Amino acid sequence: MKVCKKCILTDAYPGLTFNDEGVCSFCSSNHVFEPFGEDQLIRILEKVKTRKRGEYDALVPLSGGKDSMYILYLAVKVYNLKVLTMTFDNGFASQLAIDNMERAVEKMNVKHIVCKPDDKMLKRIYKNMLLRSGDICGACGIGIKANMYKVANDYGIPMILIGTSPLEEDSFLPDTTQDIVRFKYIMKEAGCLSKKEMNDFLIYPDLNLLKLAIGKRIGRFPKEVRPLFFIKNLPDKEMGEFITKELDWKEDTTREYSKHFDCIVEPFTNYVRYQIYGYERRMCQYSTMVRRGEITKEKALAMYEADHIMDKPANYKEILDRLDLTEKNMEDVLKVKPLKYEKHISKVNKLFIRLVKFIKK
């Protein structure tokens, strides 16, 4: 296994190359994100909020983690927006995350809506997605997006402020795990959902990237804005300290790096991804932090070693019990072929992605 001389990415990362000095293509190309600019963000916020059809300027989805809490603070206290918050209850929220959200919405004096699908249906979705594709995060992502679109539409909200940060831009699998056509194919193959359950979960069962883009243009769907891509981000530790002071946010003190502690299944999914792909989000995020100058490579390696990604997480048995999985099931999961369902993604989405890339050239 080849490891970059500057960060901790390995040759398991798809498309990664190394120069003669052993430096990966991300590091050698100075792959550090530059914000689009706060002035541009403010112009977008001011323009889009005039399209509201109700009392709220923006919807802020909350998970209880750092980024979404920080976005909530910025929206209310910095950009003076009238905000509605929502959470998709995926069945795996940590109690710490739930408590963080409750304190934050009280301090910011905002309304909070929790969208909760049927537990038994969710369990069938997660179990069968994991057994067939080795991943459950994509299904959760589909549920989050569908519900945030619905809440925004129900309340006439013109935009959604999403807490995704540049730190995560290279953190996820290239597999299109949130493709609805792919999701439908896997669920039909599993035979675990009725048509009604499928439609209830998806909410917009025929949605694709082209329909979504057109819908946003004509006001059928809200505009998605990622504020952390426009402004200079606080380092991870400083962001935690800031929202602790302003929102009484509590951190997971059991580990040094606490992104995604809001979901108790995250260590499990990282373990599975590493076994199947040879890398996972922590490796990517720590490498991005190295390139941003937040930590040294040595520090990244120490943090990564402390995560014990290659070992079964402490709550491994709990996750198996929740999803009615056996050790034999997990043996099969870890043998899943990477990107097994890529050929079943939406043709419209494929074409749309190519078109967007061509336009950006």
Report the location of each language-model feature.
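Nucleotide-activated chemistry modules centered on ATP-dependent adenylation/adenylyltransferase
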Residues: 1-58, 77-361
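Short, glycine-rich nucleotide/cofactor-binding loops
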Residues: 58-67
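Histidine-anchored nucleotide/phosphate-binding helix
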Residues: 68-80
